[in-house]
């Protein structure tokens, strides 16, 4: 190579590090103001703090050699360099620290991209999932939002794809439920594939179909899409998905909730049976388990232990309430128990300015899309409380969200709200207000709360007790994280008491009533022992709030309802929604219902809660009991002066009445005393046993580690087991015939996916409770017959799976687009044409005419001569002897028309005299 020549390949390789750094930094600045539903976990927060410091990247030519080369240029890099660049470090993985990204055997370029992102240690879901995906296993991962599950499936997919395939066809598909989540996942894919020639695109609804046609013609390797638009493009473009190697269902529970089940089943049929399927979800509803059984091959269920356990730093309190006093209990808990401060005028003004500013930004975006957004305050980091009193309130339906939010705002609190069908922009705005401490309370439903994750919370309040113990764990698990303390308060009425007893069995923590604790203190005092302390971590302490305070809170609620008509209307709607919610809620166990009746019969279940100390109401009741035990019991009818004779008819009537009911009262008193003796006998036995036991053994025996090892197999050991080396070719090897009994035994094994999924399955009720009557028929005058009221006149076509899909999916727009651009149809599996790069310059245009009065006349003349040599005609420029003498019929016709026009215009009589 001469001195004047320039090596483009080496220059690009040297500059790759600096370019990628600038891209990362610019992308980071754009996202800082964006508040998204998915919030990183504690480990990711620590690593993200180091993102501000740019990592030092060596300028060795290890970047992908042909990253910026056009299709016509040759890749001069040696094959050994490329092999070394993409080599997975299996030898180094054995030397790497266990549990690190390097221990997974990832390639060098992927480890560099991970380091650029600032990630140092994998999260628990990544540590358990990535090795299984690398072993080509189908995985069902249960992980809440913010646990790092996006990287858990993106990293192994990128590692296994490595580089762009010259064959036409998509190799990896990632399906997301919403546009925002798809864009967020696509951003992660772009960052992790930086430095490779892997092509990735995103397909979401609302974007131009023509642009998406162009994107699909670039032969992408990774496709991130929403199911509706992807199915639309598949049908419209008649895509063949036989080249798909990996399919990922992200937030799969939300995919089914949002009505994508038909699209997913249609896509599942089109996929090849040899693909690897990955399914990630925060919960496992039954429909999702059925889908996993049908669409996945021998899947592995990955669950984190934290998903089914309550933090040992969590303290719980359960408050009993009457049917009409739930709102009063909520206000009392917020004001007196949590000590929630009321909003000041400055805080209200600041919140209004924020909301008005967001509305102004929306209007400005419609008028001037290029206008820079307003700078927002940065929310609290993931390991810090948004505010000292940050509280999340769970309600059953979206109607309750509107009602409770309005009630608390009228009471003077700063409140944000989120429910399932809330607009995405409003959802982000409400979440930002809570995380940036503009508000202290967030009112949500179970469906909406599963899509967000607030890393650190001070308190959780259950407006109603959920119908499932697993949903309760999912709720209260949002506080007391990362070693922080937290409180969970639940409001329970008599209908929800059986669910509390189910929760008692599920958690292994006994219910503690006020009367039980007082008897325990009395027994300890008689035996000379110190009074036991109330443990809100190990017991489910049940009781009511002080009666006087509840009455004052109820009076406040009545005043708010009396003075606010809209609040009364919303309350009525919420009450109707609550009726539907109770109707569709799964019932409690029969045994818990029986025990709940026994507890309510004792009358001790709604005594004042131990959290509030001595009960003043009880002293008043004791005084009234003394009056009831007085010897002379006279009614107002029997009151008379001394010496007066009993001649009054009313006095005689009361004496007769007393004689009649005396035996009934005596039997009732004896039965009550007998029940009290039986209860006390069992209670005394339980209390003495608990005193002799340790604090952590509340009525239950603990197994030691040896017993557990004999019964269960350790999941980490199963993961670390190495497969025996075999020389079988899986493509041709046929195993022995297994009889039906062997197959049945294998399906009935305790370690099967069905049993594990059944243990983790629970359904969340929809927060928008509307009664649907699908079989109501109505008379159609035009058709002259009864038709289903829910039916529509939409036209459908039959898809590959036999299901009906909208006929608008096949509108012919792709064929029109392809013909207008003279593009060849996609042939899946064929070699791609090298000249089909999207940004390659392919247009051949004639140069401009050279102008003698310009300085570049000679340069332009050379361009024209070169174009003429290439056969491109330049308008107005002809070489000597180049002008065509023979004319076409069209030229002759036009010439005749011009001649006739000139003749008609100029053929005037001559002025000369003849």
From Swiss-Prot:
Residue ranges, compositional bias (Basic and acidic residues): 849-858, 887-900
Q: Where is this motif: DEAD box?
A: 250-253
| Classification of source organism | Eukaryota, Fungi, Dikarya, Ascomycota, Saccharomycotina
Instruction: Using the record, list the residue span of the signal peptide; answer none if the entry has no such feature.
Output: none
- Keyword RNA-binding attached: yes
Query: Which organism is this entry from?
Result: Meyerozyma guilliermondii (strain ATCC 6260 / CBS 566 / DSM 6381 / JCM 1539 / NBRC 10279 / NRRL Y-324)
Q: What region holds the Helicase C-terminal domain? A: 368-522
Stretch list, region Disordered? 1-81, 353-389, 840-914
Name-wise, this protein is ATP-dependent RNA helicase DBP10
Q: Name one GO cellular component term.
A: cytosol
Report which gene this protein is encoded by.
DBP10
